[in-house]
């Protein structure tokens, strides 16, 4: 095996199910300290965060990643133990290998190689890691970003190691993400016997026109490379289970993935106004996961396009699809943000895996990006 492969396997073997870090950051900090980085451990709540820097001043380039992983699910469903990394037919298997311990290991190896070759590089190279990305994402990069605001810590560019590639390494460049807003709607009615509907108020019937209007609405036509804003109902619950009882309450959970045309407060206002027009007796609880971000054409995006094109053999698709990432907390600091990482076909699945050849190529990809930004 080689350095990035060994380090990835060491990380996989640490069962860092969110929000646990399981010693991953201590291992990585040891490597970065030995390479000349100044490391600051930020324990916030029950979450471990690591901020490592080399050099000083502007521009500041951050390599952003997470050491936590999602639960493996039933271990018996895996071909091998999810926390015992195994190579079979040129493929490395283990929980978190794609999302995103392989990228984190490649970050560290690339950073070590870069500072060894460029001790007096321009600006600051930084590595930011958290153990709270796959869970609630409250005490991780969200709080670290607030700390950076208090300190006046500027960030010019951010490369997140999320698994962005679709079929081959470097075939997709993530240049933004949609915002995410969740709502839980509770509509009150009056419970009663189905034979006496005049003595009850059915919350399902009362809410149906409002829900129909809500899901039929076209929020926008998209933005740049963003698909249109989408509202999806994810859960509906009402009733006792009996078919002769009109329910007294309806609960609906929904989520919006939205473009930069919107922000969370405006969406909340629009939806509240729609519900009010239908004169419902309701309560509505919101959860804001993050605002959208978008990196327009600029140095980071153009450099990444050239580097990924060289690695993949064709220009990358430039996309804003997918879920959310911690870059949503860094972008509001004024940073240009992109996401570059391995193939994402198996993330969060049983037998999560990455091609060994892709993993071995990642450090060179990241190092080339760093050199283009901090040396040229």
UniProtKB/Swiss-Prot annotation:
Protein family membership: Belongs to the peptidase M20A family. DapE subfamily.
SUPFAM superfamilies according to UniProt: Bacterial exopeptidase dimerisation domain, Zn-dependent exopeptidases
Species of the source: Xanthomonas oryzae pv. oryzae (strain PXO99A)
Cofactor detail note: Binds 2 Zn(2+) or Co(2+) ions per subunit.
Assembly: Homodimer.
GO terms classed as biological process: diaminopimelate biosynthetic process; L-arginine biosynthetic process; lysine biosynthetic process via diaminopimelate
Full protein name: Succinyl-diaminopimelate desuccinylase
Record's function text: Catalyzes the hydrolysis of N-succinyl-L,L-diaminopimelic acid (SDAP), forming succinate and LL-2,6-diaminopimelate (DAP), an intermediate involved in the bacterial biosynthesis of lysine and meso-diaminopimelic acid, an essential component of bacterial cell walls.
A molecular-function term among this protein's GO annotations: succinyl-diaminopimelate desuccinylase activity
Reactions it catalyzes: N-succinyl-(2S,6S)-2,6-diaminopimelate + H2O = (2S,6S)-2,6-diaminopimelate + succinate
UniProt-annotated binding residues for Zn(2+) 1: 66, 99, 162
Keywords: Amino-acid biosynthesis, Cobalt, Diaminopimelate biosynthesis, Hydrolase, Lysine biosynthesis, Metal-binding, Zinc
Binding site for Zn(2+) 2: 99, 134, 348
One matching Pfam family: M20_dimer
């Amino acid at each position: 095996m080689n350095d990035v492969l060994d380090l990835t396997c060491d990380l996989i073997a640490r069962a860092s199910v969110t929000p646990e870090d399981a010693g991953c950051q201590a291992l990585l900090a040891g490597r970065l300290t030995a390479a000349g980085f100044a490391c600051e451990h930020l324990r916030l709540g029950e979450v471990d965060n690591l901020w490592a820097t080399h050099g000083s001043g502007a521009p500041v380039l951050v390599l952003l990643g997470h050491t936590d992983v999602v639960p493996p699910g039933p271990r018996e469903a895996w071909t091998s133990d999810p926390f015992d990394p195994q190579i079979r037919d040129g493929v490395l298997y283990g929980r978190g290998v794609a999302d995103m311990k392989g990228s984190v290991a490649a970050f560290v190896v690339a950073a070590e190689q870069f500072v060894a070759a460029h001790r007096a590089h321009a600006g600051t190279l930084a590595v930011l890691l958290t153990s709270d990305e796959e869970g609630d994402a409250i005490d991780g990069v969200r709080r670290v970003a607030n700390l950076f605001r208090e300190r006046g810590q500027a960030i010019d560019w951010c490369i997140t190691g999320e698994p962005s590639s679709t079929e081959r390494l470097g075939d997709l460049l993530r240049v933004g993400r949609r915002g995410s807003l969740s709502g839980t709607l509770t509509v009150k009615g009056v419970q009663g016997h189905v034979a006496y509907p005049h003595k009850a108020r059915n919350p399902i019937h009362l809410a149906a026109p409002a829900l129909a209007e809500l899901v039929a609405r076209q929020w926008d036509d998209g933005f740049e490379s963003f698909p249109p804003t989408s509202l999806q109902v994810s859960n509906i619950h009402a009733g006792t289970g009996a078919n002769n009882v009109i329910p007294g309450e309806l609960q609906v959970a929904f989520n919006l993935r939205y473009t930069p045309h919107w922000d969370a407060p405006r969406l909340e206002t629009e939806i509240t106004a729609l519900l009010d027009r239908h004169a419902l007796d309701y309560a509505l609880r919101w959860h804001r996961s993050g605002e959208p971000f978008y990196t327009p054409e600029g140095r980071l995006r153009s450099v990444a396009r050239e580097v990924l094109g060289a690695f993949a053999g064709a220009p990358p698709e430039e996309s804003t699809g997918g879920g959310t990432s911690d870059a949503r907390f860094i972008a509001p600091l004024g940073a240009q943000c992109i996401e570059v990482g391995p193939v994402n076909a198996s993330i969060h699945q049983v037998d999560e895996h990455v091609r060994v050849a892709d993993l071995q190529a990642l450090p060179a990809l990241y190092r080339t990006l760093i050199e283009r930004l901090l040396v040229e």
